[in-house]
A protein has these predicted regions:
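Short secondary-structure transition hinges
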Residues: 100-136, 174
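Hydrophobic/aromatic-rich alpha-helical bundle segments in the mid-to-C-terminal region
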Residues: 144-191
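Hydrophobic alpha-helical connector segments
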Residues: 62, 76-104, 158-161
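Secondary-structure edge/capping motif, primarily at the C-terminal ends of alpha-helices
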Residues: 75-83, 109-116, 169-176
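Basic, helix-initiating cap at the start of DNA-binding domains
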Residues: 1-28, 33-44, 58
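Alpha-helical DNA-contacting segments of helix-turn-helix folds
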Residues: 53, 60-70, 74, 112, ...
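Amphipathic alpha-helical packing segments from all-alpha helical-bundle domains
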Residues: 73, 120-146, 155-159, 186
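Short hydrophobic/aromatic patch on the recognition helix
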Residues: 43-53
Length: 197
């Protein structure tokens, strides 16, 4: 068995710290988790933490970026698998996939709070995963309804949709305000439809 390269070892330590922080934040909450908790669970020295992250807020930001990106890519992949040819139904399916994911993963939604965010997804994807963001934007621009827009405007629309969905999911699923997500879906979908027309 080949030895892991130094780069692979560093990536593994960073992943171990992220996984440890994820579990600590879920179990104890962000406020009650200490850096000592994170490094103890990851079985690394405290100094190792600071090689990768500035502080607890920095590791949380990395977690939110990672989680948000995975959710968006998952929703995009599931939408692609449905082979929906009409624009609006495809966008609504994409949104519904995100909503249903959050409904099934309330603890995760509590963890990332209102930070499910398109800019964070873009930040993650720009770190070497640009293919996914380009595929999503190309797909969005391929619909006749979007051909009138340039890539920047399409990006802004996608940004607004993801921000809106993230905020509404947190308020309605976690806080049950102003109503349950199932009650709000029709209104949310009408808002998205207006944004896309």
């Amino acid at each position: 068995m080949a030895q892991r390269t130094l780069k692979q070892q560093k990536e593994q330590k960073q992943d171990d710290l992220l996984n440890s922080a994820y579990h600590c934040f879920l179990n104890k909450g962000f406020a009650k988790t200490t850096i000592d908790d994170i490094v103890q669970r990851a079985q690394v020295a405290k100094g190792t933490f600071y090689l990768y992250f500035h502080d607890k807020e920095d590791i949380m930001k990395h977690l939110v970026i990672q989680i948000s990106s995975q959710i968006v890519i998952r929703a995009y992949t599931q939408t692609q698998e449905q082979k929906i040819t009409d624009f609006l139904p495809a966008v609504l399916f994409f949104i519904d996939t995100i909503i249903e994911y959050f409904k099934s993963n309330k603890d995760l939604l509590k963890l990332i709070e209102r930070n499910f965010s398109w800019p964070l997804v873009v930040e993650y994807l720009s770190e070497g995963n640009q293919a996914e963001i380009n595929a999503i934007l190309e797909e969005l621009l391929s619909y006749p309804q979007m051909r009138r827009l340039d890539q920047d405007e399409a990006f802004r629309i996608l940004y607004m949709i993801v921000e809106l969905v993230g905020s509404v999911c947190y308020s309605s699923i976690i806080e049950e305000q102003p109503a349950s997500i199932d009650h709000l879906k029709p209104t949310l979908y009408r808002m998205v439809e207006k944004m896309l027309m």
